[in-house]
Amino acid sequence: MIISAASDYRAAAEARLPPFLFHYIDGGAYAEHTLRRNVSDLADIALRQRVLRNMSDLSLSTELFGETLAMPVALAPVGLTGMYARRGEVQAARAAAARGIPFTLSTVSVCPIEEVAPAIDRPMWFQLYVLKDRGFMRNALERAKTAGVTTLVFTVDMPTPGARYRDAHSGMSGPNASLRRMLQAMTHPRWAWDVGLLGKPHDLGNISTYRGSPTGLQDYIGWLAANFDPSISWKDLEWIREFWTGPMVIKGILDPEDARDAVRFGADGIVVSNHGGRQLDGVLSSARALPAIADAVKGELKILADSGIRSGLDVVRMLALGADAVLLGRAFVYALAAGGQAGVENLLTLIEREMRVAMILTGTHSVAEISGDALSRVTREAAVVP
């Protein structure tokens, strides 16, 4: 298969993965309206082409939370990444480090912090959920500090799991799920050998280390379902700050009032995100929500955005709408499933190349220059861009 754009990796991943895994990463909540709008709304953002601007001094690098990034992109936290490629979190982290950007390890990763951090030569980020088991949260924060994690990404849009109907049809959940997954693995021998056999153990490393016993897929589902905490409030940020003094980013912001509260409670950054359309179907796409949030808090903290980003052009669109940087989630997992570390490195090369083209043709010399001026007048008026 020829890979000429990030979108090609989705088809390659679908061919390689058992359906329960492909649809787990590909699907969203309920009827998946928000999932689709994340992509379509971003694609509708029209840029303002400029010419004869002398673009010989173009630069994609940026500063974020005391780090220099080769481009304004980080890999998002994605649970179960180690099921998409052999020791997948390690491969993805190495790819990010090779391209000079951060990798964010999920709370529910297959590979534990202690396996991933030593595998790369730059600090990584760590994502944490608010869970009823505060002992686990303290343990995770202590281990993250010991491993040299620099930035904490605190996910706040999962006080309860979203209703993901596609999972019941694919075999990730629902009747006879274990049997269906086993049969699917048998019909995908390359994945079964490379990941299913050689990629063991398939524990949730960060949780298993704390609990002192292996945590398989069914344990993962049950443990998370029992530990999501609907009592989560802004006061939990104060509790986190007792244990974490480094940069803290609040992930899951869609409303300007919540963004202002994040500033008030001392967050260093936010991620404008609807969890990739995997939580509440029917909410705004990130691209639609971003301009009002940027208008409310731009300059008071760093604004990141995710959900729907599939190209370097999309990165430039998000920056023009008000983001300082973006997180890539599904896009890198597709590439990881299709080609491992090399696939993710190639994806990031494609993203960088597409960003360069978009910046040259919009006349923006640096990441700092990308603003609402890079958007067409029609888009600016429709999006109410600050």
UniProtKB/Swiss-Prot annotation:
The active site is at residue 275. It comes from the Bacteria. Signal peptide: none annotated. It is an enzyme of class 1 (oxidoreductase). Its cofactor is FMN. One of its GO terms (biological process) is aerobic respiration. It is a peripheral membrane protein. Keywords: Cell inner membrane, Cell membrane, Flavoprotein, FMN, Membrane, Oxidoreductase. Residues 1-380 form the FMN hydroxy acid dehydrogenase domain. Substrate binds at residues 24, 129, 164, 278. Pfam families: FMN_dh (PF01070). Its main location: membrane. The keyword Membrane applies. It catalyses: (S)-lactate + A = pyruvate + AH2. It is found in: Cell inner membrane. Belongs to the FMN-dependent alpha-hydroxy acid dehydrogenase family. Catalyzes the conversion of L-lactate to pyruvate. Is coupled to the respiratory chain. This is L-lactate dehydrogenase. The gene is lldD.
